[in-house]
């Protein structure tokens, strides 16, 4: 298994510097990861540095709480794409989902999907650690209905990350034609392989190099 091509090499911490981002970009070139996943402020730099390389530029929308307005998320998406993003990972309105406001949740996702249409993949972060199994299923169903390309477990900034059980539930819910991304707490090759075996088609990790080299040392971040 070419595990590197399933990994979004991720750096999303608030104190990320340009030097940190450049390191992630160089590692992505070297190990040929699927993408680099960075905050929107770094998209232009990443797009310039990765031009001509088979590495996508992924950024985050409404991150990490998902509580910004739909209009803000749609604008963020358009702006990120204009600066070179080819994938966007958006956070759902978790509170609205828990309130049972399916219409708001679906519209929120739909507007981001429309803003990205034909230009970028949309991955929908449902923040599994805050949801019941019924809510996880509903979030996945609404994501598919709204036209998302992927569903994703976690931001890595909440109370928990990906589990094989959640990945299996999400895969069962979305079927074979929508991607499932495991993120949050995937630190070793064994972790990553477990997620793929459960149904993940992409893995988000900051410990990507350690995963590829099968080196458990140096894999310390939550994401």
UniProtKB/Swiss-Prot annotation:
EC number: 4.1.2.4
Subcellular location per the Swiss-Prot or TrEMBL entry: Cytoplasm
GO-annotated biological processes: 2-deoxyribose 1-phosphate catabolic process; carbohydrate catabolic process; deoxyribonucleotide catabolic process
Major site of localization recorded for this protein: cytoplasm
Catalytic activity: 2-deoxy-D-ribose 5-phosphate = D-glyceraldehyde 3-phosphate + acetaldehyde
Active site: 89, 152, 181
InterPro entries in UniProt: Aldolase_TIM, DeoC, DeoC/FbaB/LacD_aldolase, DeoC_typeI
Enzyme class: lyase
GO CC annotation terms, alphabetical: cytoplasm
Molecular function GO labels: deoxyribose-phosphate aldolase activity
Pathway membership, UniProt: Carbohydrate degradation; 2-deoxy-D-ribose 1-phosphate degradation; D-glyceraldehyde 3-phosphate and acetaldehyde from 2-deoxy-alpha-D-ribose 1-phosphate: step 2/2
Pfam family, any one: DeoC
UniProt KW keywords: Cytoplasm, Lyase, Schiff base
Domain of life: Bacteria
Job of this protein: Catalyzes a reversible aldol reaction between acetaldehyde and D-glyceraldehyde 3-phosphate to generate 2-deoxy-D-ribose 5-phosphate.
Family designation: Belongs to the DeoC/FbaB aldolase family. DeoC type 1 subfamily.
Database matches in NCBIfam families: deoC
Annotated protein name in UniProt: Deoxyribose-phosphate aldolase
